[in-house]
């Protein structure tokens, strides 16, 4: 138990250290300006950002609870909150590979079979992506003229990113809800090389996709869950998209109003969904600077980015470490009790 806990601390510490080093290397040219800007941020401002960051995770938990209640009505908000933070921990420390297993194992301990757990998490992911697309579409319709007039060169690339992101969301939704799309993907998998190694991979991927499709449909095709899930997700995204605006204001940028910051933030999340990342790092930082730097100098935008990532990445990760260690301790106690 102590060795596992020590390993968890080590992995968590190394993850944060590597990300911190990466931030220093990326922003080394403007680091003195960033430090200066951050030193002017009031303590209440930091608390506000952390509160918004936690509120986003709490709303994610509400979405999770809406879906879980379809399968297990006696699950509570605390259960959903733990599932959410286990997902945060798994995404960062295992580079995404352990996210679903960690969440599904917790749900299994709460009485849900593994298939139902995977279906719940896949459904939550799809509803989130659909909501991201809806929010960005509405924001673009309302603020597209302003974006075209104030940054015509950037708007062209954003439109391309929007189209790519939208296609990915639509394809993902159809994969989980329409058997014909699943059959098409399985047929494409059949085109992979026929060697023992690739045969094993193909079978594993095909089984996983088939199970996810079967379980996700049980949730996503229920109208009440779709409506409630998307409604909660839109509120959740409103909270998330408020953080860049707050961060920019705290470091002195007043060039963007609230609605404009919401538009840019919604496009940022949609575009980054189409880009590969490692432990949730990379595309978000690039997109943040790409979208917000035109209305603030590089140092100001970089300072706001640091605040944004503290609220949406570092703080939730620290909370997720606490949740993971508590759940690991409970699991070990249960295992030892069964062994005795």
Predicted regions mapped to residue ranges:
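Membrane-interface helix starts
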Residues: 6-10, 40-49, 217-231
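A short amphipathic helical element positioned immediately N-terminal to and/or at the very start
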Residues: 32-38, 208-221
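Transmembrane helix-loop-helix hairpins in multi-pass inner-membrane proteins
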Residues: 1-36, 87-198, 277, 281-340
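Hydrophobic alpha-helical transmembrane segments
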Residues: 46-50, 77, 81-82, 118, ...
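Transmembrane helical segments that form the transport core of multi-pass membrane transport proteins
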Residues: 219-267, 275
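Short, membrane-interfacial amphipathic segments enriched in basic
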Residues: 191-212
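Membrane-embedded helical hairpins/re-entrant loop segments and their flanking transmembrane helices
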Residues: 59-85, 89, 247-264
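Alpha-helical transmembrane segments of multi-pass integral membrane proteins
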Residues: 49-56, 87-91, 128, 232-236, ...
């Amino acid at each position: 138990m102590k060795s596992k806990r020590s390993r968890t601390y080590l992995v968590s510490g190394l993850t944060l250290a590597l990300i911190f080093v990466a931030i220093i290397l990326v922003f080394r040219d403007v680091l003195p300006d960033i430090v200066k800007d951050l030193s002017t941020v009031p303590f209440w401002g930091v608390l506000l950002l952390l509160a918004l960051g936690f509120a986003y995770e709490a709303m994610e938990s509400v979405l999770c609870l809406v879906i879980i209640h379809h399968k297990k009505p006696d699950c509570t908000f605390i259960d959903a909150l733990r599932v959410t933070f286990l997902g945060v921990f798994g995404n960062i420390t295992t580079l995404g590979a352990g996210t679903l297993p960690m969440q599904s194992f917790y749900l299994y301990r709460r009485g849900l079979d593994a298939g139902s757990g995977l279906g719940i998490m896949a459904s939550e992911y799809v509803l989130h992506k659909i909501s991201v697309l809806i929010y960005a579409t509405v924001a673009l319709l309302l603020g597209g003229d302003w974006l075209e007039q104030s940054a015509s060169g950037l708007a062209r690339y954003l439109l391309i990113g929007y189209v790519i992101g939208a296609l990915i969301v639509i394809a993902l939704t159809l994969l989980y809800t329409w058997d014909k799309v699943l059959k098409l993907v399985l047929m494409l998998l059949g085109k992979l090389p026929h060697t023992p190694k690739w045969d094993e991979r193909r079978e594993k991927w095909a089984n996983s996709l088939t199970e996810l499709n079967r379980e996700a449909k049980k949730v996503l095709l229920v109208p009440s869950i779709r409506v409630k899930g998307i409604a909660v997700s839109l509120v959740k995204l409103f909270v998330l998209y408020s953080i860049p605006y707050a961060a920019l204001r705290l470091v002195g940028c007043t060039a963007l109003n609230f609605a404009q910051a919401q538009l840019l933030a919604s496009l940022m999340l949609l575009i980054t969904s189409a880009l590969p990342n490692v432990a949730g790092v990379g595309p978000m930082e690039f997109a943040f600077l790409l979208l917000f730097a035109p209305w603030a100098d590089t140092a100001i935008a970089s300072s706001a980015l640091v605040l944004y990532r503290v609220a949406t990445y570092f703080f939730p990760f620290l909370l997720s470490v606490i949740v993971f260690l508590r759940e690991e301790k409970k699991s070990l106690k249960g295992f030892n009790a069964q062994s005795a």
